Regions:
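Hydrophobic, membrane-inserted alpha-helices
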Residues: 39-42, 55-63, 81-85
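Short alpha-helical scaffolding segments that buttress acidic/His motifs in well-ordered protein cores
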Residues: 17, 58, 100-103
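Interfacial segments of multi-pass membrane proteins
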Residues: 47-49, 61-67
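Hydrophobic transmembrane alpha-helices
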Residues: 1-54
Length: 175
């Protein structure tokens, strides 16, 4: 039992760290008015196992430290709202595509308002919202398509993703 909990915690830490690393590696396009936050692709993991929600939320919170307390609070809130929708949507590629516009609207509104009012970005409020929404839509849709491709070409990868913390037996080569 303890080994399984350690394995789960380790996987969660790796996902949170990957989210942060992707944001920082692509910081030039992960923050600001025009955002293509590649790390948002990790939202799709939560379709396969709801336990990944905590890792994505933690990763978002840590990554948003770069932008200060408002982004830590509001950016993380936007992620929580998107993940609540994910939890309501059942599996299936067509249903997963719904998350792209939902994430775009939520992030467009929340982050757009934050950029306009708190960070005082001089563009019009609607421009702030639309710019953020376009990037979010593109990245999340890309994530849905990537994972749909993985499901078709290598479903065992998806089985591993679904079975976080499970005792997965790997085939051993017998010589």
């Amino acid at each position: 039992m303890k080994n399984q909990q350690v394995r789960e915690l380790t996987v969660m830490a790796v996902i949170a760290a990957l989210y942060v690393a992707l944001c920082y590696a692509f910081a030039f396009m992960s923050y600001g008015l025009i955002q293509f936050r590649v790390a948002e692709i990790l939202l799709i993991l939560t379709f396969y196992n709801k336990k990944y929600c905590a890792a994505v939320i933690l990763g978002t919170f840590i990554a948003n430290m770069l932008n200060g307390p408002y982004d830590m609070l509001l950016g993380t809130l936007a992620t929580v709202l998107v993940l609540l929708i994910v939890l309501l949507i059942k599996n299936g590629t067509v249903k997963k595509i719904i998350i792209a516009p939902a994430a775009a609207v939520i992030n467009g509104v929340v982050i757009g308002l934050m950029l306009y009012y708190i960070f005082e970005i001089p563009e019009a409020l609607l421009v702030c919202m639309i710019d953020v929404a376009i990037g979010e839509f593109a990245v999340v849709l890309l994530g849905v398509l990537i994972f749909a491709g993985i499901e078709k070409t290598n479903p065992k990868v998806i089985d591993i993703i679904k079975s976080i913390g499970a005792n997965i037996r790997r085939p051993q080569n017998k010589i």
